[in-house]
Amino acid sequence: MATLVANITLQMTNSIDLVRSTAVRLLVEVENGSRLDGLLDTDPFVDARDRRFLHQLSAGAIKWRDRLDWIINSFSKRPVKSLAPEIRQVLRLGTYQLLWLDRVPERAAVHSSVELAKYLEHSGTGGFVNAILRRVIAEGRNVAYPDVVNNPVAYYATMYSHPRWLVSRWLDRWGAAATEALLQANNEVPPVYVTLADGTADHPLPASFGTVEVEDRPGVFRVTHPEGLFDDPAFLAGWFVQDINASLATRLLAAEPGDQVLDVCAAPGGKSMQLAAVVCSGRVTATDISQQRVQRMRENMLRLQRQQIAVVVEDGERPAAMGPFDRVLADVPCSGTGVLGRHPEARWQKDAEDLRRHSDRQLRILESAFARLRPGGILVYSTCSLEEEENDTVVDAFLARRPDASLEPASVHFPGMAWSARSVQTLPGRDPGDGAYAARIRRLLPGQSRSA
């Protein structure tokens, strides 16, 4: 069956919709552990409209998976999880189009789903899919959900389609209002932000992209009409994509002209480019464990002419002998719970045990990075996680081991900001942009104490 689905795009009949059949294939692969963005990079479509529709279908069905399953199970005698993987995705896609995409005619959504089911199995399966989707049209908007008072975890997890273990911990930490806003933000189409590689406006983007500079984020612009952006000569000459909050870590690091800076786990390289624009005659050493990601960084540095950046393949847990550095940025691998809106499949591919595995590795990387920082220098530890185990807990464990390390409150550098106190923590739904964490740590001079 899986082979059959994989060959849909190669063995088409007139009755099978190419975009929707490809979406089924992608969804099956994502459910088996693949990343959606990697699959979309290899999709066969040249037409921009088809590419956008494929992305919309795939990302939407993934984000809303559990709510879609709840709706389908309300009308099916066979639980969704008991169905063949391909038929499960056909039903999810059909239901998503009927209830979320107003511009898709009901007839087109039902007909394409039925034809796909018949192609994948037989006419009887097509009849089963047709019956379910007809019920969805008639009653899908009136389905009863778990009671928010008696079972808030089940309610929020189902209504906003997130894993229950994650919803439970967020409710405990953030409360109902902030958690609901966070869940809702994760299901919205994430905005596109771009940053100037050198902090100057020598390569302004055409007005058709609708770029607007973000308040309190110098050099960061929101792109309201991003179609065609990545092929535009002005973009290629001086811009890169980066979330509004990605620059918070580099601003907290506060590198200065002439500094020698180490950027650990640097891919895709946006922070390195920001740092290079600041250090001028200094140097940025950007490291990453992945040869493929390092090659992509090198291509971006060449495109944007950032000669003061050296890109090195390196394991952050077992670094080479380099340094000491004036500034170190350790933007460590994490669970990514702050960027679930940009990676819809990630919410279904994680569990609570991932947090422990990440935190152990994060502490090792932090210790290795700090060892290459000169006395008196500054290190910023950052993640795109919302979880305390990966953020303050890691920093506290590190400080307990290193009496020559001192935490400097982030509020000094971001006064008056609700997301800035002991450390930086932005929260989607409460704050613009992705979830981001950053803590500023100074390496004390010999004989200096934390109270000094």
PLM feature spans:
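S-adenosylmethionine
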Residues: M1-A452
